[in-house]
Amino acid sequence: MKHLPIIALDFPSGQEALAFLEPFEGTPLFVKVGMELFYQEGPVILEALKEKNCRIFLDLKLHDIPTTVKKAMNRLAVLGVDLVNVHAAGGKQMMQAALEGLESGTPAGQKRPDIIAVTQLTSTSEDMMRSELLIDRSLQETVIRYGQLAYESGLDGVVCSVHESKALHEHISPDFLTVTPGIRLLNDQTDDQKRVATPAYAKEQGVSQIVVGRSITKADKPLEAYHQILKEWE
């Protein structure tokens, strides 16, 4: 069986996030806690989710000097989450430091969380790269390069769009995790994300794991939407 779809809990408070999850009681879930929710609630929300037997992707996208990132990862390692991330743009030294901090901070006898690197945000377009960031390479070239750096740094995978997943597996390793946000059911709004795809297309492209937010959290019947996505994905 593939990894479960990750539900992005993009809510401003723990109360709203936990209320949203009530209809899912008894359903095995993998959820994502991002900056908004974690900065509001802190580790308390993680404990509440673990009580519901949720697996957790703590999506904080660390990006700072290596020493700071290492110390931060050392602290995150004790929180008992399953997946964490950094920005690949921080470079190899920073990514290696993140991994070291995670390994040294993971309590004895426990598996360390998987760690992945963000390549290019799904809101990024090639036009933006050229006009604002002065990057002349193609978007796919930069994603593959960031992926190679993450792999060389010992990380478990990357965050990318569905459209780069196959190329990453071909250039790096079929076992390298590709975790892809920007997943929508057909006819759903894309909002601020530019590089989006359906669960079925993600499956075709060999994606390791999908992250789904609004197609579930904004659905009239979230549990039904989740099972529709699960059916397409499996």
Swiss-Prot record:
Its EC number is 4.1.1.23. InterPro entries: Aldolase_TIM (IPR013785), OMPdecase (IPR014732), OMPdecase_AS (IPR018089), OMPdecase_bac (IPR047596), OMPdeCOase_dom (IPR001754), RibuloseP-bd_barrel (IPR011060). Substrate binds at residues 10, 32, 59-68, 122, 184, 193, 213-214. Keywords: Decarboxylase, Lyase, Pyrimidine biosynthesis. Disulfide bonds: none annotated. Pathway: Pyrimidine metabolism; UMP biosynthesis via de novo pathway; UMP from orotate: step 2/2. One of its GO terms (biological process) is 'de novo' UMP biosynthetic process. Belongs to the OMP decarboxylase family. Type 1 subfamily. This is Orotidine 5'-phosphate decarboxylase.
